């Protein structure tokens, strides 16, 4: 049976798939979301949390494009915390523990409420390809779904294999079959495939934990939502427990490490560097006498606890033994053993910046299939792939997230230009311009682009336009309120007596002054600003000097990406560059700096070194040419 009439088909109902389907539908594409089971849409397969350092920035950017993750997390969040709250705004990371059930139900409700989006239950087995481009999807039961654009968001399901000690079980996650047919399809297309792995800890019965003997970590007093559309958090907040592994824990693990699937040679996939198993921690950091374990409740009406920090692939009986040596867990009962899962992924260098496969028009990939790890990274790719699939289906130009204006752009550029050798995770350190790419200004950076693209709903557009007007009016007011140095000193603002008038905005750029200090000088004028607007302007003004410099640097980078490299450029003479990079650049012979930047292994530091050398060399050549002309 053939179904016609879809513009976009999304395969997979996880974090990438839900954002992809929603994004495509918001652009007006008739969209089908294909999933094994409707009730698994939005399932949190691993840890019950959203956001964090770098990751929280991605959630805010998804929200700025009118995506779903931020709003759903605000409904399901049961412990909101702003990480790095005491540090600068650029590195603060919004995060929440989430109730798994609430999150899944809220995401399903959001998908079901999206106009133009159908949910189709079943197993996508193969792609329908016609004249060198995607024509639809072939289901395992023989159904054919037709569409000019398909987004694959298969997560860990591509030839997924779960490991618990020596036991191996084909699965995409516990209790769900892997996807074998699509993996074969990708290999048949000639795409470069690799094998990665991730892992998860045992799930514990919270009723058997001695909560009195562990530390506690609660939510912040001031709960900061993810979404621009959320006015306040109303879900009840809970505490997490905090404990540590012991020498006895380590002894059991080390004595039995040969039984770990990771260390027995049974697993061929590469694991995530920044989310190591407890076995990895002991091998790499054996000198430590303990490792922190966060006991994270999985829901308000669920006694299951996720012990974050002890991911493992040891046999179940050894897991039970080492868990009982951790303070507070002496009597803990395991509900589900921890496990490692390995799966196929596609080399993301097979993709364009729109996440379309170069070898097959109309096929887009998003999420762990591209070598990333994490809900937020997957969701951000799903957003980009869904938008571009919808644009392709209407013969429109693709939309590319820029590296200079979004963390989504940083991630996609990293993936498509450099590829991955291990699961990719977002950090603020990956962005060259993180003072500009803050979590607090994601809406100001991206919502105007989303509105121009047409993927923002009327309510958000109206609220954002009003907010932007408030910001502009507030900024103008701050710049109009000025005082002389003597007037400032009389008001308690200690500045140099240099005769120059300074505005309220100028004072906010100084680290010693904030709105509280300025309201003593201008109580009536500044008292009218909403707290959210005042906070945004305070951060903006505080960074203003640096942002001006960074804006210039961004413009410089865009120019430098077009800078030509001489065909006979001698990379071996470039001191400070590794021998490996010298060899790769000499072999690739990039035409310009933009091409050099995507050579495998190139880092921002290496690009900067190349630019300095080229500027110096080309400046010398211009100077020599000028000297020759003068002598003539």
Curated annotation (Swiss-Prot):
Gene Ontology biological process terms from the UniProt entry: tRNA methylation; tRNA wobble uridine modification
One MF annotation (Gene Ontology) recorded for this entry: flavin adenine dinucleotide binding
Amino-acid biosynthesis among keywords: no
KW tRNA processing (keyword) present: yes
Cross-referenced SUPFAM superfamilies: FAD/NAD(P)-binding domain
One protein family per Pfam: SAM_GIDA_C
Cofactor names: FAD
Amino acids binding FAD: 12-17
Localization per Swiss-Prot or TrEMBL: Cytoplasm
Binding site for NAD(+): 271-285
GO cellular component: cytosol
Keywords: Cytoplasm, FAD, Flavoprotein, NAD, tRNA processing
Family matches, as InterPro entries: FAD/NAD-bd_sf (IPR036188), GIDA_C_N (IPR049312), MnmG (IPR004416), MnmG-rel (IPR002218), MnmG-rel_CS (IPR020595), MnmG_C (IPR026904), MnmG_C_subdom (IPR047001), MnmG_C_subdom_sf (IPR044920)
Listed PROSITE patterns: GIDA_1 (PS01280), GIDA_2 (PS01281)
Main location: cytoplasm
Described purpose of this protein according to its UniProt entry: NAD-binding protein involved in the addition of a carboxymethylaminomethyl (cmnm) group at the wobble position (U34) of certain tRNAs, forming tRNA-cmnm(5)s(2)U34.
Complex formation: Homodimer. Heterotetramer of two MnmE and two MnmG subunits.
Family, as annotated: Belongs to the MnmG family.
Name by which UniProt lists this protein: tRNA uridine 5-carboxymethylaminomethyl modification enzyme MnmG
Species per Swiss-Prot/TrEMBL record: Rhizobium etli (strain ATCC 51251 / DSM 11541 / JCM 21823 / NBRC 15573 / CFN 42)
């Amino acid at each position: 049976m053939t179904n016609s009439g879809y513009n976009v088909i999304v395969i997979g109902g996880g974090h990438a798939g839900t954002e992809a389907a929603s994004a495509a539908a918001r652009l007006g594409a008739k969209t089908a979301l294909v999933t094994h089971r409707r009730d698994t849409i939005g399932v949190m397969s691993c840890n019950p949390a959203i956001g964090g350092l770098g990751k929280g920035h991605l959630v805010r950017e998804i929200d700025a494009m009118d995506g779903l993750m931020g709003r759903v997390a605000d409904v399901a969040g049961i412990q909101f915390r702003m990480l790095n709250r005491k540090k600068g705004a650029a590195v603060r990371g919004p995060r929440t523990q989430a109730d798994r059930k609430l999150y899944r139900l809220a995401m399903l409700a959001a998908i079901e409420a999206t106009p133009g989006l159908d949910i189709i239950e079943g197993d996508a087995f193969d792609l329908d390809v016609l004249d060198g481009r995607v024509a639809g999807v072939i289901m395992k039961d023989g159904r054919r779904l037709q569409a000019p654009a398909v987004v694959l968001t298969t997560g860990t399901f591509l030839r997924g294999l779960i490991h618990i000690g020596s036991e191996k079980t084909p699965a995409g996650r516990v209790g769900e079959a892997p996807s074998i047919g699509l993996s074969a399809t990708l290999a048949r297309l000639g795409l470069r495939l690799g094998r990665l792995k991730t892992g998860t800890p045992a799930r514990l019965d919270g009723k058997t934990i001695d909560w009195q003997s562990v530390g506690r970590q609660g939510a912040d007093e001031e709960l900061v939502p993810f979404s621009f559309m959320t006015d306040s958090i109303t879900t009840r907040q809970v505490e997490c427990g905090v404990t540590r592994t012991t020498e006895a824990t380590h002894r059991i693990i080390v004595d039995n490490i040969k039984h770990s699937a990771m260390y027995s040679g049974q697993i061929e996939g590469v694991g995530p560097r920044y989310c190591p198993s407890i076995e990895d921690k002991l091998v790499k950091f054996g000198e430590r006498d303990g490792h922190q374990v966060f006991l994270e409740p999985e829901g308000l009406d669920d006694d299951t606890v996720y012990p974050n920090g002890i991911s493992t692939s040891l046999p179940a009986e050894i897991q039970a033994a080492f868990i009982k040596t951790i303070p507070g867990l002496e009597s803990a009962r395991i509900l589900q053993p921890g496990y490692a899962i390995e799966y196929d992924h596609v080399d993301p260098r097979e993709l364009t910046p729109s996440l379309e496969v170069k070898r097959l028009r109309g096929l887009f990939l998003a999420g762990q299939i591209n070598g990333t790890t994490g809900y937020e990274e997957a969701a951000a790719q799903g957003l980009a792939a869904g938008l571009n699939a919808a644009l392709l289906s209407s013969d429109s130009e693709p939309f590319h997230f820029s590296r200079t204006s979004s963390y989504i752009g940083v991630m996609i550029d990293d993936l498509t230009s450099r590829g991955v050798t291990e699961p990719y995770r977002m950090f603020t350190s990956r962005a060259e311009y993180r003072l500009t790419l803050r979590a607090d200004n994601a809406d100001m950076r991206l919502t105007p682009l989303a509105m121009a693209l047409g993927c923002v709903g009327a309510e958000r557009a109206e609220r954002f336009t009003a907010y932007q007007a408030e910001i502009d009016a507030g900024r103008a007011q701050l710049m109009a309120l000025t005082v002389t140095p003597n007037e400032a000193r009389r008001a308690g603002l200690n500045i140099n007596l240099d005769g120059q008038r300074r505005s309220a905005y100028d004072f906010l750029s100084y680290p010693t002054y904030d709105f509280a200090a300025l309201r003593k000088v201008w109580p009536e004028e500044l008292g009218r600003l909403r707290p959210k607007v005042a906070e945004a302007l305070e951060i903006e003004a505080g960074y203003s000097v640096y942002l001006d410099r960074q804006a210039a640097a961004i413009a410089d980078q865009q120019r430098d990406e077009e800078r030509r490299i001489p065909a006979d450029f001698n990379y071996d003479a470039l001191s400070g560059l590794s021998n490996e990079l010298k060899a790769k650049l000499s072999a690739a012979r990039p035409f310009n700096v933009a091409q050099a930047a995507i050579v495998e292994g190139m880092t921002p530091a290496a690009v900067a070194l190349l630019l300095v050398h080229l500027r110096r060399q080309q400046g010398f050549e211009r100077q020599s040419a000028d000297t020759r002309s003068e002598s003539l």
